[in-house]
Amino acid sequence: MATRRDLVVGLAIAPTIPLLARSVFAQEAEATPADKLETSQLVYITPIKSNGEESRCKAEIWFIHHDGDVFVVTPPETWRARAVGKGLTKARLWVGEFGVWTQSDGAFRDAPEFMARASIEAHADVHAKVLAAMGEKYAQTGWGRWGQRFKDGLVDGSRVMIRYAIASGGQQVDE
């Protein structure tokens, strides 16, 4: 049962709730796209076709922001890896967490956005650094299950690492 004291304390702090909420929203609004690369668990990716249009294929995927670029690990038969193999190296990336892209009702499109140039990263030393960083980032969200698969896959060819070099200013990617 609530006491008179509980009521008085509740009434005393109630006016501060909107101020606290505004402060939290203001901090979120002040976050830059680069900040989101450090805090988000997912990036949404689509290749840009040769005619300049986005591919119909998009996906949400684990990533790591390392040395200014975004890295993902994926099977070589996925559309994002095949696009790079076909020379479709321009890509658009959105950073945020909206669940499965097909069920997000396009919400990811309002997230911070980057244009990037994709390439297959083949250097074992880069693989090791990126996987170590991913292990730290995803330690609580499934790395125990996926980390060794990523590492083994990069060795046996069942996975590739894609580097997305973010365009200067995040906007245009030169030809």
Locate each region found by the language model.
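Short, structured beta-strand-loop surface elements
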Residues: W79-G169
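Short beta-strand segments
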Residues: S40-P76, L93, E113-F114
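C-terminal segment of N-terminal export signals and the immediately downstream linker at the start
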Residues: M1, L19-E38
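Extracellular/periplasmic catalytic domains that process cell-envelope and extracellular macromolecules
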Residues: K36-L37, S55-C57, I64-H65, G85, ...
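Charged, amphipathic alpha-helical segments
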Residues: E28-A29, T78-R80
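N-terminal secretory signal peptides and thylakoid transit peptides that target proteins
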Residues: M1-P15
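Short, P/G- and charge-enriched loop/turn segments at secondary-structure junctions
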Residues: T32-P33, K49-S50, G147-D152
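Short, solvent-exposed mixed-charge patches
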Residues: D174-E175
